[in-house]
């Protein structure tokens, strides 16, 4: 079964329809099915799939389904990464743009929500709720709003960036897009201050870079050996470094510096000077934030060298500013410890020397820098000459001049110059504190060379930068690092320098300006100084000794050379030949090795290609197998999903599905789900019914109780309301009366005031009437004329309208009368049809009842007949057993007298022979016939089933044939006095009553098996008496040929003639053949097949149960050929459709009359 899938165009239309009706989830599922279907993956171009992909990503953004968007993006990448990279780039950029727009909208919404909250109440800005919230969670309203509104979209945008980076990390065609998205992710972290996400992003990019460096053999993989890839990675790491510095994540910045240095070392091309300058600048900033002044100054020095050498348009001011920066950073380096090896005894992961070596590698230095080496390099580069006079003096005061009494005052002036500089461009202010510390250390060292002891007060006067506590701390640090011998006497508030002359654990190397050595150092180096002085004295006393020794040594060397020069020359020539031979041998070995290596590589390449081809074939087979399995599983899941979706549209279906989890639903099939749905529906119906009953009872009780309680309250309320209404009416009436009186008084006063104007009014009216009397009369005539014309017109219109109304009313009455008569006729016809249908129904019911009664009666007779047959069979078996025992006894008695039989025969003549033959024959014949009867009884039982089958058809026509059969039976009884038609009581049949002739009375119809037995026994006796006549056919006419010679009932047969027809004459004539059923009709064969069988079909087989040569129809009393009414099988119960068919058939088949 093929899986039904929609085409991409239809899926897009379907999704738009779902979106219009407010079902985005259904729309997303529709589009997702397209991307999951592998049939459409490569069958359509990007012009068809790209709009669908944009709609898919739009729905993912709207619903915040980042994992579903990831799945679709991966599918789209696999489809178009080698076909159309621009389409993939447009889709990814559009996806990220939508995510950014939604995030910005959420940020604006969050800010607007906070603004609304802040402007809600200007009089009460700090509400109790806001105070409690800030005290509990430590967040303001903006933070809470961002967490609720903004944070979900920020998380979605972050996941989108991560998915796109993972999608494009190994695709060389989308390498530029990958680095653009990385920069967008850095901007995201800066904009929303996501430090933890920034760290994860750095780790992710570093992991991607490691993967690229490890494997670069893929077809679409990114190769780190490409110059473009190296430059893109370097630019991205520089951007990462800038972002880390802005976010003050110095650890990530240091890791980024390591990555940048690794990329620059990996690149075969020298980085551009701009990149290197940016690198040294950022590195100096990181070292400054880390507090490593030594490497900070080294980085600035490298930057200064690079800028000075490569920047051609560098101005003097810029050079002076950079030189001052470098000089001040170098001078601010703390004085080094005299024993750095002390750190070796501290347990740490890495020793300081290893760390320093690693940092020196980042700067491109062969060994870690020191303060002395940096100052020496600064002097070599002539940096002190490039700076201003003040900073040049600073260098001289700290590194050249020895003036401890004025050192701090001089440095303070430089500090004041730095502090008073512009704040925006002042890059030297971070070095002030370090410069002060270096100045204090210089002061202490210079003081120790001048003074043996000094008071704290005096030393504080000289060290104007610090207080007593800071000074004491610096002194302790100097002793800790074993730089100086210092002892502090707090009792005297004094400081002692170099008091222990026996202690000097290091060689004194003056760093900076020095006046003299310390006493302990002088004692430690006394022997060395003595040796130097003595050597100098010997050289003065014996000035030519050394020259003579050198001349003698030279002569010996020349003599030795002349002795070995030839031998050495030959050795050198031989060595040269050996070297040439060795080179040739090595070259041959290399060529052979290269050829072998080439052959080996070619063989490995061939094997690899074969293995790869085999692997691809296996993968293709595996993909096909999985695809087939997935399609089958998808079909099952789709059918199940459709069933679940169909069920979920109903309330009970949703309730039933809510009880099942995903695993439970997958284990069920559609039938089980439908079954559970029906069960759930029934259960809900029962629950609803019970709830309604309980609710009905509860509401009934509640309403009755409520109304009983309401009655006194209503009475009280009505009484109070009547009182209040009465009071209100009285007050209102009183107010109304007062207002009416006041109005009356006001009107009367007004009337009295206006009475004096009546004469003036009358005069004015009279004058006006006189002026306009003629005009009034003229207009009055025109009005009367127009009025008369309008009256006539309206009267004429009314006459016409009334005439038309009467005509329409007459037509309506006629139409209503016609419709009424038609309705009466239709109702009368419908009533007649209903009455006729009811009469037919009653008639059919009566006929069915009649047939049912006949069928029950016939069935009872059949059961009675079967019971009697069974009893006769049992009795016959017992009689046969008794006869066999008696025959055995008689055989034992007459066999010894075998000679008497002939004499008896001769004495008796023929009659005697006949007597003994007739007396002996029935014994064997009786046994034989008994067996035949038993066998015939079995056949009767077998044929009983056929009669039962035909009984249904006979029963249908039994009602019409009953009277005819009874009439023929009465005629036969009156015409024939044969013993076959006489019925004796069962008692007489059982007692064996004899007739008037002295012979046993013949058996009744219920003993039909006896009639056939007697007839056969008589025929058997005749056969023995007259042997030659055994071949003659002495049967009467009705027994020969199997057909009756007459059309009447069989003589001596009390059974009614069979309506189904047993005579060939009963076949329908030519006129009746059209009414017959087809020959293949089973009912026709069953009804007509009883007597239409030929002699061959009715004749028994040889050795059959009859025991004679005659047919089964021989003898008119044979029960097989003349079954009575009680032998007919019981009719079948009619089905409703069969009754209708048979009702139609009755009119067709009952027209065939017996002739």
Swiss-Prot record:
Residues 319-502 form the PCI domain. GO terms for cellular component: eukaryotic 43S preinitiation complex; eukaryotic 48S preinitiation complex; eukaryotic translation initiation factor 3 complex; eukaryotic translation initiation factor 3 complex, eIF3e; eukaryotic translation initiation factor 3 complex, eIF3m; multi-eIF complex. Residues 836-900, 925-987, 1004-1057, 1066-1101, 1125-1145 have a biased composition (Basic and acidic residues). GO terms for biological process: formation of cytoplasmic translation initiation complex; regulation of translational initiation; translation reinitiation. Residues 1104-1118 have a biased composition (Gly residues). Keywords: Cytoplasm, Initiation factor, Protein biosynthesis, RNA-binding. It holds the Pfam family eIF3a_PCI_TPR-like. Residues 589-613, 836-1155 are annotated as: Disordered. It is found in: Cytoplasm. GO terms for molecular function: mRNA binding; translation initiation factor activity. Component of the eukaryotic translation initiation factor 3 (eIF-3) complex. The eIF-3 complex interacts with pix. RNA-binding component of the eukaryotic translation initiation factor 3 (eIF-3) complex, which is involved in protein synthesis of a specialized repertoire of mRNAs and, together with other initiation factors, stimulates binding of mRNA and methionyl-tRNAi to the 40S ribosome. The eIF-3 complex specifically targets and initiates translation of a subset of mRNAs involved in cell proliferation. Belongs to the eIF-3 subunit A family. This is Eukaryotic translation initiation factor 3 subunit A.
